[in-house]
Amino acid sequence: MATFELYRRSTIGMCLTETLDEMVSSGTLSPELAIQVLVQFDKSMTEALENQVKSKVSIKGHLHTYRFCDNVWTFILTEASFKNEETTEQVGKVKIVACDSKLLSQ
């Protein structure tokens, strides 16, 4: 199964990468094993979001920038509002990256 490496830029992905780098630097972990952990992280995040997340959210905001390159859409919104059934959250600036899920099956 192919995966995207997008989730490595999330907070949890960056913390994992930083921890793995520290472990490789100290000799606790081999670089090859660290790469395997990151590949498994990519697969697990894709699977979890695909199978376990059931809630829906609507997003409104001012479109600052958009880009389409290599079947990947990137949107940067300012003054964004995220709304689900229970709550609304205001965010000053948000970057949304959307990939075609059909690319995963290639």
Curated annotation (Swiss-Prot):
Oligomeric state and partners?
TFIIA is a heterodimer of the large unprocessed subunit 1 and a small subunit gamma. It was originally believed to be a heterotrimer of an alpha, a beta and a gamma subunit.
Gene Ontology terms, MF aspect? RNA polymerase II general transcription initiation factor activity; TBP-class protein binding; translation initiation factor activity
Q: Per UniProt, what is the name of the gene that codes for the protein in this document?
A: TFIIAy
Q: Which key words are in the record?
A: Initiation factor, Nucleus, Plant defense, Protein biosynthesis, Transcription, Transcription regulation
The free-text function statement in the UniProt record for this protein reads: TFIIA is a component of the transcription machinery of RNA polymerase II and plays an important role in transcriptional activation. TFIIA in a complex with TBP mediates transcriptional activity. Protein involved in the resistance to X.oryzae.
Where does this chain mainly localize?
nucleus
- Which InterPro entries does UniProt cross-reference here? TFIIA_a-hlx (IPR009083), TFIIA_b-brl (IPR009088), TFIIA_gsu (IPR003194), TFIIA_gsu_C (IPR015871), TFIIA_gsu_N (IPR015872)
Give one Pfam family, short name only: TFIIA_gamma_C
Give the similarity note. Belongs to the TFIIA subunit 2 family.
Per the record, the GO terms for biological process are: defense response; RNA polymerase II preinitiation complex assembly
Can you cite an annotated GO cellular component? transcription factor TFIIA complex
Has the keyword Glycoprotein been applied to this entry?
no
> What subcellular locations does the record give?
Nucleus
Know the name of this protein?
Transcription initiation factor IIA subunit 2
Other facts noted in the record for this chain: The displayed sequence corresponds to the form of the protein present in strains susceptible to X.oryzae.
